């Protein structure tokens, strides 16, 4: 049996899934995006009238994702230092990865190779 974990401190999941699920002493976070919990906006994202991306700010989005992950971890009684695996999907590896990786390295200082 699993325990469902949701929090108002992170944006509401878009689908029929919780923010996280605890099974025994393991915690599994669902896909956590960059939407702001307060107003459901995506920081740094500009769309045209048809909803197509005009521009985005990978730094602002990454910082918001990390804030959302932290909120879910804290709501579950866990913390950032207990993360053991991260899966990330970037829109443009060549452009986005250097910025993302810089922020990742600042947040995950204890797991540097």
Residue ranges, per PLM feature:
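Short, polar/acidic, helix-capping and beta-turn segments at strand->helix junctions
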Residues: 2-113
């Amino acid at each position: 049996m699993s325990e469902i974990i949701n929090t108002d401190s992170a944006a509401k999941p878009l689908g029929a899934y919780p923010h996280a699920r605890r099974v025994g002493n393991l915690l599994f976070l669902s896909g956590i995006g960059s939407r702001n919990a307060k107003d459901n906006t995506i920081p740094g994202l500009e769309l045209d009238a048809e909803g197509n991306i005009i521009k985005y700010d990978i730094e602002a989005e990454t910082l918001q994702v990390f804030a959302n992950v932290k909120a879910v971890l804290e709501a579950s009684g866990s913390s950032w230092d207990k993360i053991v695996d991260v899966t990330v999907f970037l829109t443009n590896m060549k452009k986005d990865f250097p910025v993302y990786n810089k922020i990742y390295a600042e947040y995950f200082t204890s797991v540097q190779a």
